[in-house]
Amino acid sequence: HPKTKQWRNEGFLPSLAGGSHRTVTGGCAIASGDSSILLVGGVNYDRFRDALNHPEPDYLLHPADWYKFNTSLLQYNTFTKHWTHLGNYEELARAGAGIANNANTVIIIGGELKPGIRTPEVNAFKLTCHP
């Protein structure tokens, strides 16, 4: 709380399939409706951690899919404190993208496809339902 300068734990991000850690480093989020936050993009926890702890000279030479940037569309309900996985979409595999919500159309702007390679692509999808 801003006045008391105290934070509380709201919970944790859901793990990836197989139980791997999820990170949202480089991801982006936006409010949706009166009780939801949409979370998209970001780097892969294991790939990013390994690159920091054990740098390899060929790290930047891999194809984009090797980096396993997050393709998940996650929704967090601020009332129930529950995460819902709304699907996987290749268009969301970005780090450092911008995001906007216009009349339930979510727009993803630019971002990195892999370390050092940015895209000028702008992708949009219509959000058909949210709690």
Regions found by a protein language model. Give the residues of each.
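Kelch-like beta-propeller repeat domains
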Residues: 1-131
